UniProtKB/Swiss-Prot annotation:
It holds the Pfam family Ribosomal_L33. It is found in: Plastid, Chloroplast. Its main location: plastid. One of its GO terms (biological process) is translation. Belongs to the bacterial ribosomal protein bL33 family. GO terms for molecular function: structural constituent of ribosome. Keywords: Chloroplast, Plastid, Ribonucleoprotein, Ribosomal protein. The lineage of its organism: Eukaryota, Viridiplantae, Streptophyta, Embryophyta, Tracheophyta. It comes from Pinus thunbergii (Japanese black pine). This is Large ribosomal subunit protein bL33c. One of its GO terms (cellular component) is ribosome.
Length: 68
């Protein structure tokens, strides 16, 4: 069982262009990736360039807030 103050945390990356266009219902869904990051080395929110299957192109995926 992981400690609550663990350095490595599991985060979710979400497509930024899909979330902006989801208001207008242009795409059928929102692309999400899960990964792990080290809180000590990367204290700020992580952004990565990933492929979005709904936009059919590489877009910036940003870290989203964890919902428990």
């Amino acid at each position: 069982m992981a400690k609550s103050g663990d350095i490595r945390v599991t985060i979710t990356l979400e497509c930024t262009s899909c979330t902006q266009d989801s208001v207008y219902k242009r795409f059928p869904g929102i692309s999400r990736y899960t990964t792990r990051k080290n809180r000590r080395n990367t204290p700020i929110r992580l952004e990565s360039n990933k492929f979005c299957p709904y936009c059919y192109k590489h877009t910036i995926h940003g870290e989203i807030k964890k919902r428990d």
